[in-house]
């Protein structure tokens, strides 16, 4: 990594909404990283979007220029199979209907085209809004096991066929490709952590599979046509029925608490009870690979890509054919990562193994706008095995002195230039207090603002 782009605080400058769209977004947002406001406004006089200006309003709808229109493709609770009743506005559905319906709170998504020219949409269902999904309850919370299960089934991934008819895209019920992936879907564990003692539970004595995925945030896709879904804020779903259970440094580092916060998943499934399954949290916090074209395939949790609060997974092919995956840990004071496969894409038959065998790196930025990728292995981190590096990736990154960042979220590579960008959301703790691991979160050149409310974009050349 070198030639890190200089950041300037442009948040106090006034940029018109339309100018931002025309000159910033037209170049993938990179114009926002120019060194001065003048270079942004002078970036280009060419108009990339020819549409009528839309005035600001606070109407409870989507307002588009008159040349455009919008429509809903799918929404929470839409049945994916014809044997499921239509969404009931009064009951807000049941756990049985939710299992076969579109999940809640869409986040990352990707389109896939099948060999028979069908269009599939893979959508992350990140979390639930209790005030909506449990609006049939006075408490606006899950009040019994069935309620908890309904909330659980609303998490995960929804994969369904969509079809365009008269300029309206709609979900195709009963498509052979339709699939719900939930916190109960069996998944294969791959990479260094597979079979490690830290992955073994009462249900999985060999530590070779995980049960489900949840809090799926951003996404990614592979050149071989599979979907990558990223597990983010997985920590809030665990609790302990034993109030005397003492937390550990590893649990604390990932924000996993013993106190129940209202989701009550442990009441429906004991694996979320830390006093009964202390290793269960080690099975979540990964990038999960799903083949949307094969609804009978088993999803894979790739531990080689590290365990943290993944935002998205930006996968590119390097000049030597190796797979490179850029990833951000979306929490204040956490890190930016890179994974590089051991083999090149044209030398392996099972392309999925490229995400199981490789090396994990974490970014360190210097004050002269250069940087380096620090290898995370047993020698550099002092951890006893590569499996521990992959399970306790945050601890590993802290040990090598990586640069704490201001919530690294979505990462995107430029398909026409040798550069990568990462959006950093904010960090109210910058220059004020450490992260959960006690790492300094000082003001520096790459994170130049104390109490950073607005974030920044970092660009680097691999």
List each language-model region with its residue ranges.
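N-terminal secretory signal peptides
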Residues: 1-19
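C-terminal segment of N-terminal export signals and the immediately downstream linker at the start
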Residues: 10-16, 35-66, 70
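N-terminal export leaders
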Residues: 16-33
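Blade-edge beta-strand/turn elements of extracellular beta-propeller
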Residues: 61-72, 83-97, 167-207, 290-307, ...
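Beta-rich catalytic cores
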Residues: 105, 215, 283, 309, ...
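Short, conserved, GDST-rich strand-edge loop motifs in beta-rich repeat architectures
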Residues: 126-151, 235-278, 341-344, 426-451
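Beta-propeller fold recognition
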Residues: 145-151, 155, 168-183, 334-396, ...
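Beta-propeller blade signature
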Residues: 155-163, 255, 283-292, 339-340, ...
């Amino acid at each position: 990594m070198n030639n890190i782009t200089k950041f300037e605080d442009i948040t106090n400058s006034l940029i018109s909404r339309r100018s931002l769209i025309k000159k910033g977004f037209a170049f993938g947002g990179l114009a926002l990283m120019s060194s001065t406001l003048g270079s942004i406004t002078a970036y280009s006089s060419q108009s990339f979007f020819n549409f009528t200006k839309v005035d600001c309003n606070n109407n409870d709808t989507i307002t588009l220029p008159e040349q455009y229109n919008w429509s809903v493709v799918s929404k929470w609770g839409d049945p994916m199979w014809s044997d499921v009743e239509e969404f009931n506005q009064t009951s807000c559905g049941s756990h049985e209907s939710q299992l076969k319906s579109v999940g809640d709170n869409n986040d990352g998504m990707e389109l896939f085209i099948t060999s028979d020219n069908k269009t599939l949409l893979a959508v992350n269902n990140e979390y639930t809004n209790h005030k909506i999904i449990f609006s049939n309850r006075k408490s606006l919370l899950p009040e019994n096991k069935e309620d908890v299960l309904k909330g659980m089934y609303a998490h995960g991934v929804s994969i369904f066929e969509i079809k365009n008819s008269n300029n309206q895209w709609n979900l195709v019920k009963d498509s052979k490709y339709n699939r719900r992936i939930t916190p109960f879907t069996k998944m294969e564990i791959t990479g260094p952590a597979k079979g490690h003692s830290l992955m073994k539970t009462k249900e999985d004595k060999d530590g070779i599979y995980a049960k489900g995925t949840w809090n799926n945030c951003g996404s990614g896709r592979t050149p071989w046509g599979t979907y990558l879904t990223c597990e983010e804020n997985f920590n809030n779903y665990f609790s302990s029925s034993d109030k005397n259970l003492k937390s550990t440094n590893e649990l604390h580092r990932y924000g996993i608490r013993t106190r129940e916060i209202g989701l009550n998943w442990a009441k429906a499934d004991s694996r979320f009870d830390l006093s009964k399954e202390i290793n269960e949290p080690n099975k979540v916090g990964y990038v999960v690979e799903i083949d949307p074209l094969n609804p009978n395939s088993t999803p894979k949790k790739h531990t080689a890509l590290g365990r943290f609060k993944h935002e998205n997974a930006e996968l590119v092919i390097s000049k030597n054919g190796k797979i490179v995956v850029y990833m951000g840990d979306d929490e204040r004071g956490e890190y930016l990562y890179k994974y590089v496969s051991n083999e090149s894409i044209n030398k392996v038959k099972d392309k999925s193994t490229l995400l199981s065998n490789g090396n994990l790196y974490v970014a360190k930025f210097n004050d002269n706008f250069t940087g380096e990728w620090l290898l995370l292995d047993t020698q550099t981190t002092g951890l006893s095995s590569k499996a521990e590096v992959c399970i306790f990736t945050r601890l590993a990154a802290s040990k090598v002195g990586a640069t704490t960042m201001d919530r690294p979220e979505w990462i995107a590579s430029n398909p026409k230039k040798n550069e990568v960008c990462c959006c950093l959301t904010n960090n109210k703790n910058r220059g004020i207090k450490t992260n959960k691991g006690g790492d300094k979160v000082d003001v520096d050149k790459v994170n130049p603002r104390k109490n950073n409310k607005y974030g920044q974009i970092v660009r680097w050349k691999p």
